[in-house]
């Protein structure tokens, strides 16, 4: 998928809206003046005059619309690394125990030699020991914003009759991490999120968030394997999650496993027997099926 970003004047904006009128779509982004989708390409015209085309046919549609592609601010495929990028990723959403760590990191091309020397890669391919060694170095060198949602706070916010579900809470965390990083004066040419939902669904949930920013977003599956900025965020977030998991375990006197398998069921049942439901409210995500499985183990 390609992304084209152009700056167009009022006359061209008016002409564009007329051409794409039959293809108009809604956008929850308050900074977007006009949105359309044609031939699989999403077109976003911002109030600032910035025009963004996202999709595999971005170049072809730009030519069809007679847009000044030669004046493109940047043109990048989803695995381009030659521009300053903010990458955002989360860790912990699939684990019963522990919170959710979300990190947004800013990587400039000048950082690439440092990152490659460290062997930065998708954190899912690295051992926990390696991550714990690399993460502090990244935190010191790379501008980033880390957020950790504790299990206790997660349980207050996520579930039936509560403000968020498992998807919308991640939208809120990613949005806030990126927003806070931008507030530090960071100026990326692209912002990439490791895709955990569709762009339209992301924008739907984003509508209820207080903080917004005008920068367009690129959503890519397994983005941590394509962008160093997302890989950095993945590593820092993994380390933050592991630290939180370890601290929760120390508080309760149990070693808490990562993931949502049978090992989590077993430890959860032990915690229920020792401390009651309050221990899971403190250390785990209660809406996971592991809670009921742990309760069932107690009756055996």
UniProtKB/Swiss-Prot annotation:
Q: How is the cofactor bound?
A: Manganese or magnesium. Binds 1 divalent metal ion per monomer in the absence of substrate. May bind a second metal ion after substrate binding.
Task: Supply the SUPFAM superfamilies for this chain.
Answer: Ribonuclease H-like (SSF53098)
The record's subcellular locations are: Cytoplasm
**What is the native source organism of this protein?**
Streptococcus pyogenes serotype M2 (strain MGAS10270)
| Stored InterPro entries | RNase_HII/HIII, RNase_HII/HIII_dom, RNase_HIII, RNase_HIII_N, RNaseH-like_sf, RNaseH_sf, TBP_dom_sf
Residues covered by the RNase H type-2 domain? 83-300
- Keyword Hydrolase assigned to the entry: answer is yes
Q: What keywords are assigned to this protein?
A: Cytoplasm, Endonuclease, Hydrolase, Magnesium, Metal-binding, Nuclease
Entry's EC annotation: 3.1.26.4
- Offer a single GO CC term for the protein: ribonuclease H2 complex
Role of this protein: Endonuclease that specifically degrades the RNA of RNA-DNA hybrids.
Q: By its UniProt entry, which PANTHER family does this protein fall under?
A: RIBONUCLEASE, RIBONUCLEASE H2 SUBUNIT A
A Pfam cross-reference name: DUF3378
The UniProt family comment states:
Belongs to the RNase HII family. RnhC subfamily.
Disulfide bond residue pairs:
none
Q: Which GO terms describe its biological process?
A: DNA replication, removal of RNA primer; mismatch repair
GO MF entries = magnesium ion binding; RNA binding; RNA-DNA hybrid ribonuclease activity
Which named protein is this?
Ribonuclease HIII
